[in-house]
């Protein structure tokens, strides 16, 4: 089923959204033709997402799941006559759920880089950056200003991977690098002064700055750049 979904997601996105969501399995004409033959075999697309990850996946004022990636998944499912099943998941349980086939894919601002050996990915559909957000009145304007400060990020996130990898030297200057289960709590702690900075995706930073105008600012230099793709079980 996974391979069929990968193939079908590719051509559905190209057709209805002009987003190149290629499968990574193959993009040949032969596979394009075979996707027409297999679409009837798939009835439900089960998408795992983090429901506290705006603007990609979150709960609206009516407690209904919404967000850019969920809208994209819904359009793909609609164009192919599939039922879409959205499963809010604990982010640190995503691998177990994927390997147990409780979900078909992870579609929620999911970074490819550094995870290529762990998942089968579609081709990337978005360029993203990891950034640092601080309070506007913090006086922190660059990476040097983070020395001896407490920085928080989401557990098992791309930002954490960067701070433990390519930017480990920078993280070594922090007083502490903390992790939380979601970014909503991270920004609540930043607003309350419990932490000094949040490391997160660019789009999350922009969302929080827009929703809390004047409260936060983003350091000019990014931690890293990366690509988003849909992740499937390896193999």
Residue ranges and their predicted role:
Residues 51, 127-134, 202, 206-235:
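Periplasmic-binding protein-like
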Residues 134-151:
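Flexible hinge/capping segments at coil-to-helix
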Residues 74-79, 87-88, 92-105, 120, ...:
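Short helices/loops that flank or line small-molecule/ion binding pockets
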Residues 20-24:
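C-terminal motif of bacterial Sec signal peptides marking the signal peptidase cleavage site
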Residues 45, 68-69, 116-125, 216-221, ...:
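A structural signal for short loop-to-beta-strand junctions that line the ligand-binding cleft
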Residues 59, 73-82, 159-180, 209-213:
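Ligand-binding cleft/hinge of the Venus flytrap
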Residues 35-109:
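Extracytoplasmic small-molecule ligand-binding "clamshell" domains
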Residues 26-28:
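Bacterial signal peptide processing site
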